[in-house]
């Protein structure tokens, strides 16, 4: 595994943003409708043990181990 957290988008090194899969659900009722958003954050690469530092490096974890 690299020194980068698997769940961070490090295109911009000044910030570390969690990546995930977003699902949108539209619920339609006879009188109203609304949109609900759910997010599933992917921790497959690092088993959820990684913490991202401001430089997007992996700190205090065993990424992918």
From Swiss-Prot:
One GO-annotated biological process of the protein: intracellular copper ion homeostasis
Keyword Metal-binding part of the UniProt annotation: yes
Molecular function in Gene Ontology: copper ion binding; zinc ion binding
Keywords: Metal-binding, Metal-thiolate cluster
Keyword Metal-binding (UniProt): yes
Known function: Metallothioneins have a high content of cysteine residues that bind various heavy metals.
Family classification: Belongs to the metallothionein superfamily. Type 15 family.
Protein name: Metallothionein-like protein 3B
Originating organism: Oryza sativa subsp. indica (Rice)
Lineage of the species this protein comes from: Eukaryota, Viridiplantae, Streptophyta, Embryophyta, Tracheophyta
